[in-house]
Each structure stands twice: as C-alpha cells, then as structure tokens.
Amino acid sequence: MSNFAVAITFKLLTIMMKENTVKIFEQSFKDNWDRPCLTDYNTKETITYADFARDIAKIHLFYKEIGIQEGDHVAIIGKNNPTWVTLFLATITYGAVIVPILQDFNPNDAQHIVNHSEAKLLFASKSNWERLDFENMRMVRAALSLDDCTLYEQKEEEVVADVL
C-alpha cells in the first residue's frame, strides 16, 4: 500500500471514529437528558446530562470565538473533576487534541509538555498554575482556571472573550 493510500485510509478512519463517537454521545445525552451525569465527590454537586451537553456546547463556542481549530492542542493540568471531564470531552468532540498532564508532574516537566505539544490554550488548577511560568509557554495564547474557567493570563489583548 502506498504512503498516499495509508494517509487517505487513516484520514477516513479518523473521520469515521470522530463521527461515531459524537453520535454515541449525542444519543446518550438524548436518552438521559434529565438524569445525573457527573458528580463532584468533594462538593457533592451533581450535573445532569442536559447541563453537561450545554457546558460542552459553550466550550465549543468559546473555542470558535478564540480561534481554536480542529487539530489545535489544548493542555489541561489538575485534579480530575467535572470541569476536567467536560473540558476533555468538549475538546475531543470539537476536533482539537487534548493534552492531559498529570497534576503531580514537577513544574519543569509540565511546562516542557505544554511547549512540546504546542498547546494554544491551557487549563490549570490554581495550585498547578502558581508553579508554571506563562511567559515561557511559547504557543499558549491564554491560560484559564480549571476550577471555574476564569482567565489567569493571556498573551494578546482580547484573545479570550467572556464566553464561558
């Protein structure tokens, strides 16, 4: 099989996987709209599938507003929580690439992963954010809180609108 045929086959498989994955989630949301979806065991707050779907849609709009495109990388570092899960699923269903970074990595390693991945956007928990050096993240245009999606810092004025 030629390199061209392999590339076309891979592209078709990628498209089919994305379409099928999105369809599975869409059907799950429809079937369970009013049922509990995610629970934060620290706060005991539970969100429904409807809330989850709306949050994913808001993140998609946010990505579009700030110019994130399919294939762009979005990094996330912090403890797993409902926001982490929502960002993860929103990113992959948008067509961007999620770069999950273990919260326990030392700051130099975490920063290296962000830079090496060429992430354009970073979501970080407060404790992780305080240990990172935003100015040395070459490609990251904006960094937001993993806890409440508020803006920590951005490189250009007006990059991040109040979409979230």
Model-identified regions with their sequence ranges:
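Intrinsically disordered, low-complexity segments enriched in Ser/Pro/Gly/Ala and basic residues
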Residues: 1, 27, 142-144
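Short, positively charged and aromatic/hydrophobic N-terminal segments
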Residues: 3, 9-14
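N-terminal non-cleavable signal-anchor helices
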Residues: 6-7, 141, 160, 164
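Conserved AMP-binding/adenylate-forming core of the ANL superfamily
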Residues: 17, 37-81, 85, 89, ...
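Structural core segment of the AMP-binding/adenylate-forming
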Residues: 66, 93-159
